[in-house]
């Protein structure tokens, strides 16, 4: 039957990408339908029970700055929080949290069920409705046809998914869930460029069978024995509205054990029955989250590997042994687990497995994540060749935004590489593609000094507000923070300290030595060993400001002070990076003609011509980042375009992007 109600946006899949896509489109006012094979698994953490990490935490903060759900759900469900790289500079500091699976899923479902403009429907999607070269809806497995103006496909590992345990394999989307075979076949009919990838998960262990006395305890930040005892971090910029760290459930530790020579011997004994080494698995696995058999094979000289025992929640005894993802036969899994200290009597609750699935080459996507072949069809998440909850959530939000904008008849929103990790993620995928599951790192961002976790809201919340993603409560909190940062920065720059009026004892206490001439407070704060709190207590507190005190700003006070202090200490570095951004921006604004025949650009090598013809970059900046396209090739392309003696120049667009001419 044809469902009687039409929608603006249909989202297929209810994982981390799908939920953020649906919430974003609905927040922007689009009539949105989320189709999932099982409403009970909305927001399910299919693999590890954690959110965040290096690069990944930055994405979560950006999703949050745009009104997304992941950070708040993690604050509501997080049972351990840590700031990684806390001793390093702010650009690479990252938040990571262990989450209670049940609480996380419940938080996501509540947000979905209470979001205006969003409808949920439980049915697997078997087909897409396509008229000409445009998608117009989706068809479920029982033949219900839903019409829409855009479809966001977030199928995760379900497209023709196959689970491997040893030499045994069976069709599945993940353990306990059926694969999307018909939908996979339909996408192949549409001739979208496709490949196979694989990922894996470790066996789960009953905590009652673990001897924790043989393991090393790893408390979270704020816990007894942890860093900053009594001060548990939060993820969301809006956590203060819900009590800050008080909204977290009970905090618990993780534990550490190690593999050993016996473990490695057991693993090697199973290589002849490993689907990875016997060719049963065709897909490429994630480089930065390899299976334990891959680690033992690749790093044969390493005598031991760290294994983190992570609790799955407060109401279960289940533990996730991070570091032993495997598809080895179960008898090998059983022996390798029991070979480690503390796990000698471990009971395995679920076997580890590898899952192989279809993905589609993201280089065939427009910069909005709309497919080039089918108008109105957007891809997000693992279908684009990525791995990780955070990467999926960021892509889902991005695709949901652009699907909603398309329904409004408005151009796509694409953040630049210097504006967001989301911009780096999108640009990497559409220009470089993937040869293995892609995960985010801070090292992928060349402008990471200005892409920090702490300023994600300062970078993105205004854009989110313009698009309708940010509600009044978030906007009010952001506006207070932004204005307080601006006022306090100006106050520090305009408040001068004269050596005649500053007692030497106070100068030495706070600054380390007496000052020889007049300085403003901002310049004093730039000194490596001078902190904001110490500076404002100098000389009896005469340089303090009530405007940024906890009494005035409440929970926002700490984040305002953090922004001001980072701006001062890294001012020189950030200014230099802004100069680099401006130089790079020239290429980003040069739009390439849509119908340019690169094969006719005789000055370029055959390899470069073929790559440009295949990937069809939208701007000269994108072209410069395609693998194999050299700076010399870009210069030659510029010369060819500036001659201008050919058809197909794009008209001057209204959005400020220039056309090469």
Curated annotation (Swiss-Prot):
Its main location: cytoplasm. Its cofactor is FAD. It is found in: Cytoplasm. PROSITE patterns: GIDA_1 (PS01280), GIDA_2 (PS01281). GO terms for molecular function: flavin adenine dinucleotide binding. It holds the Pfam family SAM_GIDA_C. NAD(+) binds at residues 285-299. Keywords: Cytoplasm, FAD, Flavoprotein, NAD, tRNA processing. FAD binds at residues 13-18. Homodimer. Heterotetramer of two MnmE and two MnmG subunits. Belongs to the MnmG family. NAD-binding protein involved in the addition of a carboxymethylaminomethyl (cmnm) group at the wobble position (U34) of certain tRNAs, forming tRNA-cmnm(5)s(2)U34. NCBIfam families: mnmG_gidA. HAMAP family: MnmG_GidA. This is tRNA uridine 5-carboxymethylaminomethyl modification enzyme MnmG. The lineage of its organism: Bacteria, Pseudomonadati, Pseudomonadota, Betaproteobacteria, Burkholderiales. The gene is mnmG.
